[in-house]
Amino acid sequence: MASLGKVVLTLADIAAQLGGDVLGDSQTPISRVAPLATAGEGDITFLANPKFRSQLSACKASAVILRPDVAEEFPGPRIVTGNPYAYYARVATLLNPYQSGLSGVHASAVVESPVPDSVAIAPNVYIGKDVTLGENVVINAGCVIGDGVSIGAGTVLYANVTVYYGCSIGQQCIIHSGAVIGSDGFGFAPEGQSWIKIPQIGRVVIGNDVEIGANTTIDRGALEDTVIGDGCKLDNLVHIGHNCKIGNNSVLAGCTGVAGSTVFGEHCVVGGAGMISGHLNIAAGTTISGGTTVMKSILNPGVYTSVFPLDTHEEWLRNASHIRRLSKLAERVSELEKKLKEKDIEG
């Protein structure tokens, strides 16, 4: 069974791999990462937000990751770096390496394609014909890999992932349990009172270093491929419709839905439960707040929000009733302005 390993490193070991300046005892042993308020012996913590700097004086961690401007506010061992939060993430990876607990191909797996000796395939996996797996791919229990799929080196599929025929997943990706890659897009042509299914003949193409959350679904393209760019991170329960293009290093939080044929530029961020209509273009560098509904293209990068502010139910109803009358109120204001102008002219 897959798990995270446990490692003990000194501050000197960590700095040798990640950089940063060690102040204090460089041989301090570190076995865990922990929050600033609760870290203790053997733990390393970090200060990324200045509003928590008052906690440094009471911190009992063996070491702290700090920016240069606050490096002298903690008397114990510390690592000084420009981005403590990113540094913490890398330290956590060093101390908790992924261990698949698997080796070779389990006897219950059905594998219809040749695979490298370094690949690990768990029980009850099905791998179809003409599948290409890179070195050190890990496929956990119950996964289904359709014919003609390509999966790059170092990629991990957790239990019960389904990858439909012809799809491509890059190197060093993580696909969490229950994700479905390459199911049919929602394509139907109206004919009278019925609907004719449109065969979805494109693929899903996922770049390198992509993470796909649990129970996320990515539809295959209708004619062109659905593309998830390098470095993208999709949370749990995200849906990507057919023909979408998600630009490199974009991040989509849980329950986001992107309708078909929408194109995101690079480095976009969508908060949880963002709803993006189809056939739109979203400019590179755009941030969309959680719960926002986007119904037209965003051509200029920035932060966009369409969520009605939280209020008591009574106040919300009152404000909602005003919103329903906005068009009439605007007409009345326009009439009043017109009358005032007429009076000014007469006066």
From Swiss-Prot:
Pathway terms, separated by semicolons: Bacterial outer membrane biogenesis; LPS lipid A biosynthesis
Stored Pfam families: Hexapep, LpxD
EC number per UniProt: 2.3.1.191
Name of this protein: UDP-3-O-acylglucosamine N-acyltransferase
Gene Ontology CC, one term: membrane
Catalyzed reaction equations: a UDP-3-O-[(3R)-3-hydroxyacyl]-alpha-D-glucosamine + a (3R)-hydroxyacyl-[ACP] = a UDP-2-N,3-O-bis[(3R)-3-hydroxyacyl]-alpha-D-glucosamine + holo-[ACP] + H(+)
Residues at the catalytic site: 242 (proton acceptor)
Protein species of origin: Dechloromonas aromatica (strain RCB)
Encoding gene (name): lpxD
CDD domains, per database record: LbH_LpxD
Keyword annotations from UniProtKB, A to Z: Acyltransferase, Lipid A biosynthesis, Lipid biosynthesis, Lipid metabolism, Repeat, Transferase
